Swiss-Prot record:
Amino-acid positions noted as binding L-glutamine in the UniProt annotation, renumbered to this chain: Y54, G351, F379, G380, F381, Q382, E402, R459
Organism in which the protein naturally occurs: Thermococcus gammatolerans (strain DSM 15229 / JCM 11827 / EJ3)
Name of the protein: CTP synthase
UniProt xrefs under InterPro entries: Class_I_gatase-like, CTP_synthase, CTP_synthase_N, GATASE, GATase1_CTP_Synthase, P-loop_NTPase
Keyword Kinase: no
Functional pathway: Pyrimidine metabolism; CTP biosynthesis via de novo pathway; CTP from UDP: step 2/2
Family indicated by similarity: Belongs to the CTP synthase family.
Annotated control of activity: Allosterically activated by GTP, when glutamine is the substrate; GTP has no effect on the reaction when ammonia is the substrate. The allosteric effector GTP functions by stabilizing the protein conformation that binds the tetrahedral intermediate(s) formed during glutamine hydrolysis. Inhibited by the product CTP, via allosteric rather than competitive inhibition.
Originating gene: pyrG
Length: 533
């Protein structure tokens, strides 16, 4: 019988429900249970694909092409797994499905309502995923009390009734502030949040109390008393330096152990040895390199969350910490490349649109001409081609037709299948595609394989008409699409210490114990630049 754990949030948003859910999933998997995570996003968008990163953080891309919430990236990294588009349930998806069924006459003339039709659709989607698992952790986005989240909380309540209390548990993540004026942790916001949850028919089984410092015993007792949750199930989740410490903290607090007993699962000791070694190694690193990320969404670091994590994974693999220098691409246009002085490596990440593109190309040229380890990703790959065409081939005015449709040298152009589309959502080249890697190249040394599968999210590509000219000037296209040999996937400069760019997003498949090869190589090159081989 599948066990369900619903994770809800209260008091304020941004508490770390995603990390809590991912950590709990990892602890269950470490006990040998077949575990997966589902994220519910109550917004009306069908998916995250058309959202501004400043509003919602990065758009994470799955193997099947799903454009989803960044929390699914945390789930994949913590559980070392690959999820599907169905693992992200949105209000947009649910309502679209219900309206489609109504139009087909599947409700037999009934008045279609939130209860039971919307709630039934939600439950059906959760159960569809659950068939192959022992434990399913469902994170409900937003905060208890939000209008958008009400149908999902109601569906969760109904699931406990239908599946049986012994098969469904609730974990509520709250915030316990400490006021400087009185110097004590205040539990009243948590009490009110649980009161709101109970008014919806849900009694939490465990409370994860987020705070700056470890939860005081007096606060733990008070939360237990006023929320009707056992003291052992009031979990202290205080701020830590590294999110990968959270599973170890929650294990020490006994959250998974308590839920295993609560759900009648066999009690097992988790295998956390490798995870603990990884965390301890990261904390003990004494060398440091600085890598610049030159982007257009750098004011919100979550816009590039997977890149941050891939650098962290690679830092452990290379015995050196990575300090990130966040640089707004438009600032490079205004202030020049002096903003890049002293860095040990440069990344130009993905993005869309003209804003900051010239600044990104200034950074690419600086890396190329000064032999600074460089990695370009997606749009960064395309702009690397543009920069090379302009400054090495001498094609003045060369550009991508995305930015300059009238460019005399369209070295980057819209893919043929992307023309004449009447909608933006879900229409890019999305998901995992095969990439064929050429022998005797940097890419082959990094990957060690001839064929790799990497995740994509793009509409533009290197114009096949210019490939021969670019290669004759020294640019090496070392990776080619498996589905179209005229589509370039990886480029590199062989006479450079480390200069590589990819049309795909390698960060989406990077894992704590298995860093993405191009990131691992970048950090290694940065370390060698600073400390020698």
């Amino acid at each position: 019988m599948t066990k369900f754990i619903f994770v809800t949030g209260g008091v304020v948003s941004g508490l770390g429900k995603g990390i809590t859910s991912a950590s709990l999933g990892m602890l269950m998997k470490a006990r040998g249970f077949r575990t997966t995570n589902i994220k519910i996003d109550p917004y009306l968008n069908y998916d995250a694909g058309t959202m501004n990163p400043y509003q919602h953080g990065e758009v994470f891309v799955l193997d099947d092409g799903g454009e989803v919430d960044l929390d699914l990236g945390n789930y994949e990294r913590f559980l070392d797994t690959s999820l599907s588009f169905d693992h992200n349930i949105t209000t947009g998806k649910v309502y679209s499905a219900v309206i489609e069924k109504e139009r087909k006459g599947e409700y037999l003339g009934a008045t279609v309502q939130v209860i039971p039709h919307i709630t039934n659709e939600i439950k059906e989607r959760i159960r569809r995923i659950a068939r192959d698992y022992d434990v399913v952790i469902v994170e409900i986005g937003g905060t208890v009390g939000d209008i958008e989240g009400m149908p999902f909380l109601e569906a969760a309540r109904q699931m406990q009734l239908e599946e049986g209390r012994e098969n469904v548990a609730f974990v509520h993540v709250t915030y316990v502030p400490k006021l400087k004026v009185v110097g004590e942790q205040k539990t009243k916001p948590t009490q009110h949040s649980v009161k709101e949850l109970r008014s919806l028919g849900i009694q939490p089984d465990a409370i994860v109390a987020r705070s700056e410092e470890p939860l005081e015993e007096s606060a733990r007792r008070k939360i237990s008393l006023f929320t009707n949750v056992p003291e052992e199930a009031v979990i202290s989740a205080y701020d830590v330096e590294d999110t990968y410490e959270v599973p170890l903290m929650l294990e020490k607090e006994g959250l998974a152990r308590y839920l295993v007993r609560r759900l009648g699962l066999p009690e097992r000791e988790p295998d956390l040895e490798k995870w603990r070694e990884m965390v301890e190694k990261y904390k003990s690193l004494d060398k440091e390199v600085e890598i610049a990320i030159v982007g257009k969404y750098v004011k919100l670091a979550d816009s590039y969350l997977s890149i941050k994590e891939a650098l962290k994974h690679s830092s452990v693999a290379n015995d050196v910490k990575v300090k990130i220098r966040w640089i707004e691409a438009e600032d490079v246009e205004r202030k020049g490349v002096k903003l890049l002085e002293g860095v040990d490596g440069i990344i130009v990440p993905g993005g869309f649109g003209a804003r900051g593109s010239e600044g990104k190309m200034m950074a690419i040229r600086y890396a190329r001409e000064n032999d600074i380890p460089f990695l370009g990703i997606c749009f960064g790959f395309q702009l690397t081609v543009v920069e090379f065409a302009r400054n090495v081939l001498g094609l003045k005015g060369a550009h991508s037709t995305e930015i300059d449709p009238q460019t005399p040298y369209p070295v980057v152009d819209l893919m043929p299948e992307q023309r004449d589309l009447d909608r933006l959502g879900g229409t890019m080249r999305l998901g995992a595609y095969p990439v064929h890697i050429k022998p005797n190249t940097l890419a082959k040394r990094l990957y060690g394989r001839e064929i790799v599968y990497e995740r994509h999210r793009h509409r533009w590509e290197v114009n096949p008409d210019y490939i021969e000219k670019l290669e004759s000037a020294g640019l090496v296209f070392s990776g080619i699409a498996g589905d179209d040999e005229r589509r370039m996937e990886i480029l590199e400069l062989p006479d450079h210490s480390y200069f590589i760019a990819t049309q795909f997003h390698p960060e989406f498949k990077s894992r704590p114990m298995n860093p993405a090869p191009v990131f691992r190589g970048l950090v290694r090159a940065a370390r060698e630049r600073k400390y020698g081989g």
